[in-house]
Amino acid sequence: MNNCRQNLENFDPEVFGYLNDEIKRQEEHIELIASENFVSKAVLETMGTELTNKYAEGYPGKRYYGGCEHVDKIEQLAIDRLKKLFNADHANVQPHCGANANIAVYVAVLKPGDTVLGMRLTEGGHLTHGSPVNMSGKFYNFVDYGVDPETGTIDYENVRELALKHKPKLIVAGASAYPRIIDFKKFREIADEVGAYLMVDMAHIAGLVATGDHPSPVPYADFVTTTTHKTLRGPRGGAILCKEEHKKLLDKSVFPGFQGGPLEHIIAAKAVCFKEDLQPEFKEYTHQILKNAKAMEKVFLDNDVRLVSGGTDNHLLLIDCRSFGMTGKEAENVLSEVNITTNKNTIPNDPETPFVTSGIRIGTPAITTRGLKEAEATKVAEFMIDALKKRRPAEEIKNDVVELMKQFPINR
């Protein structure tokens, strides 16, 4: 029991050392992975509280364990704040992640073998939108739609044709690598035409939706799933919004249908995050995300770099690395050497495998959290061009990156 009184540094210096290495990496690197962000001190603090000790199966006021009177209040706060943030009828804040949120909706409205329409992974979708390597693709009959090969944007007429042909029980809208505005009203019209439920996965754009920087799916979708990190800038976790008539069905699907005990320390951190997202400053933040993405877009286009769909309407850009005569994997490695973190990503009609790819995906949420604005975002894009076109020595670019990021410390 004496071990319980020791701090991390004293009890496990090995883990403590690796933790500090990661903190140093985050400080000295430019984080451009579109799904990553930096949480506030308040969110970080909440995740490390004694709430992690508490089991609380069930929902506020209806638990299977005693001693839940305080976590009930916290979880209800998270629910109420999330509903207010998106003007939603109902919210479930228990999903451990975005994938769990998606699967919970499937469990709620589908039976194994039911037909679902979802976006093709290689053209911007997500593993849980029916990829054959994911349980969604194994349990359900997913028919996939993609983007127009010329424009790189969703072909809504093709979506409609597929829906009319296959009569899906559920249509899934939303993406993990799509840089343009999604027309949720069109998806609703298609769903209504074939009598399907509509689920929107807004994990990537949730922060933008909350502030009006992207149209909201909430008025149109039966279910809306999201992560709570990414553009919401909260702890790693998931959440689901739904219409009032689906409330009981959804809650039963999350628990006991798909999950057991909720992570109340994470739910508390979600509550803190949602309070942050309701502040006026959060609107300024999401507006700046878009400004920074546009600033980077200009640099790439001015340097004859091909961007999928020709640019961006949101927080992310999808870069065709064949513009530099290399694969996405090679580009990711080149940028990593100069302390710029990205991820290789498939692009429409990609001739490479998912482990190699022809593209990289970048996003501006994390650098915007650190305080970078258009001038610095422009500089970051120029660093990328310099590295990928080998205009300057890698060590010189890396030094410039480290010096730039010293001006924008994390959580200071």
UniProtKB/Swiss-Prot annotation:
N6-(pyridoxal phosphate)lysine PTM sites in chain numbering: K230
Which GO-annotated molecular functions does the record name? Answer: glycine hydroxymethyltransferase activity; pyridoxal phosphate binding
Report the top EC class in one word.
transferase
Q: Name one GO biological process term.
A: glycine biosynthetic process from serine
Annotated site location: Plays an important role in substrate specificity: H229
Reactions that this protein is recorded to catalyse: (6R)-5,10-methylene-5,6,7,8-tetrahydrofolate + glycine + H2O = (6S)-5,6,7,8-tetrahydrofolate + L-serine
Q: Which InterPro entries match?
A: PyrdxlP-dep_Trfase, PyrdxlP-dep_Trfase_major, PyrdxlP-dep_Trfase_small, Ser_HO-MeTrfase, Ser_HO-MeTrfase-like, Ser_HO-MeTrfase_PLP_BS, SHMT-like_dom
**Annotated residues for binding of (6S)-5,6,7,8-tetrahydrofolate:** L121, G125, H126, L127, T353, P354, F355
CDD domains referenced in this protein's UniProt entry, alphabetically = SHMT (cd00378)
Q: Where in the cell is it found?
A: Cytoplasm
EC assignment: the record states 2.1.2.1
Q: In which pathway does it act?
A: One-carbon metabolism; tetrahydrofolate interconversion; Amino-acid biosynthesis; glycine biosynthesis; glycine from L-serine: step 1/1
Q: Name one GO cellular component term.
A: cytosol
Keywords of this entry: Amino-acid biosynthesis, Cytoplasm, One-carbon metabolism, Pyridoxal phosphate, Transferase
Please give the cofactor(s) recorded in the UniProt entry for this protein.
pyridoxal 5'-phosphate
Question: What's the subunit arrangement here?
Answer: Homodimer.
Job of this protein: Catalyzes the reversible interconversion of serine and glycine with tetrahydrofolate (THF) serving as the one-carbon carrier. This reaction serves as the major source of one-carbon groups required for the biosynthesis of purines, thymidylate, methionine, and other important biomolecules. Also exhibits THF-independent aldolase activity toward beta-hydroxyamino acids, producing glycine and aldehydes, via a retro-aldol mechanism.
> According to its UniProt record, which protein family does this protein belong to?
Belongs to the SHMT family.
* Entry protein name: Serine hydroxymethyltransferase
Native organism: Finegoldia magna (strain ATCC 29328 / DSM 20472 / WAL 2508) (Peptostreptococcus magnus)
Q: List the gene name.
A: glyA
